[in-house]
Amino acid sequence: MNIRPLHDRVIVKRKEVESKSAGGIVLTGSAAGKSTRGEIIAVGKGRVLENGNTQPLDVKIGDTVIFNDGYGVKVEKIDNQDMLIMSESDILAIVEA
């Protein structure tokens, strides 16, 4: 399915959380928790400013990001995978290799 978010929205595929503790214990279920890292799958054209101009987003397709997993983040099933739709302002950082 082709999908393009509007304005300053992005679509993020959540990365799997590490399932082992620091001591090597395998974590399952809620103990493993949800990851707040993901990969940008699609981006909107940018935020529309008051003067009508569009400010491009700082993130791009393929970026790994850390995001705020809370209010305003929508989970949607796309191609049988859960994807997150959020505003760029919900992204806290870009992970640089």
UniProtKB/Swiss-Prot annotation:
The keyword Heme is assigned to this record: no
SMART domains: Cpn10 (SM00883)
Single GO BP term: chaperone cofactor-dependent protein refolding
InterPro entries: Chaperonin_GroES, Chaperonin_GroES_sf, Chaprnonin_Cpn10_CS, GroES-like_sf
SUPFAM superfamilies: GroES-like (SSF50129)
Keywords, sorted A to Z: Chaperone, Cytoplasm
CC annotations in GO: cytoplasm
Transmembrane segments: none
Major subcellular location class: cytoplasm
Gene Ontology molecular functions: ATP binding; metal ion binding; protein folding chaperone; protein-folding chaperone binding; unfolded protein binding
Pfam families attached to this UniProt entry: Cpn10 (PF00166)
PROSITE patterns: CHAPERONINS_CPN10
Function text: Together with the chaperonin GroEL, plays an essential role in assisting protein folding. The GroEL-GroES system forms a nano-cage that allows encapsulation of the non-native substrate proteins and provides a physical environment optimized to promote and accelerate protein folding. GroES binds to the apical surface of the GroEL ring, thereby capping the opening of the GroEL channel.
Family: Belongs to the GroES chaperonin family.
PANTHER family with a match to the protein in the record: 10 KDA HEAT SHOCK PROTEIN, CO-CHAPERONIN GROES
Protein name as it appears in the record: Co-chaperonin GroES
Gene that this sequence comes from: groES
